[in-house]
Amino acid sequence: MTVEYQRRLEKHYDELKWLYCELYPNGQGRFEELCAAMEQWYKERNKKWKALDRKREKQKDWYKSQKMLGMMLYIDAFADNISGLEKKLDYLKECNVNYLHLMPFLATPKGKSDGGYAVADYRTVQPSLGTMEDLAALSEKCHDQSMSLCMDFVMNHTSEDHEWAKRALAGEKEYQDRYFFFDNYDIPSEYEKTCPQVFPTTAPGNFTWREDCHKFVMTTFYPYQWDLNYANPVVFNEMVNNMLYLVNQGIDIVR
């Protein structure tokens, strides 16, 4: 463990452990796994991002600056793909944009993407937009122009095409436990008494019957978006890993 990482961990360790164990009273082992994973992601973080981290440690409210001018966009609508967006950075700079918020760009199934919010793979860019290498190159160029990069990180649910969902459908209990599965409608009916509907017209109800596994699964958005079960510490840890992987590509802000 480096001195820098140890200093940061010690500063937040007690609060982090307390909060984690409040969520997961029997999760000491999972907490240790989380800490080990965070250290590994720190080790893999490149020197440029580490230098930026140090700078921002000294200016903790950097993201609140009145000098930040943001722009939110869908990559394909603005520039076709990530490479095209990179070519338009000079134009954005001329407009004084220094905070670039990218709408969802991760891999989603065709026809069931919900505008990019039905993620099938958190470590793969939608092929029509480019590759993860393209994203890393874009972030490098953004930072060369003092432009911060933000992304939408969809953490409430995954696509039914996600590996976890596929393995859950195949009957693997470990993966069913990462979602909300029910053998009958008894418990879902209780949820429905108080749980509001996100899309009452286009996708009414919060549960979907899956004939392929003879179970109900919680789907508060669309039937192809399965809610993640954060009562399971494995879900929390794995999603943190996904987030830190993306942050190490040069993402500054996660929404």
Model segments located where?
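Receiver (REC) domain switch/active-site residues of two-component response regulators
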Residues: D252
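Acidic/aromatic-lined carbohydrate-recognition and catalytic surfaces
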Residues: M1-N232, F236-V240, L244, N248
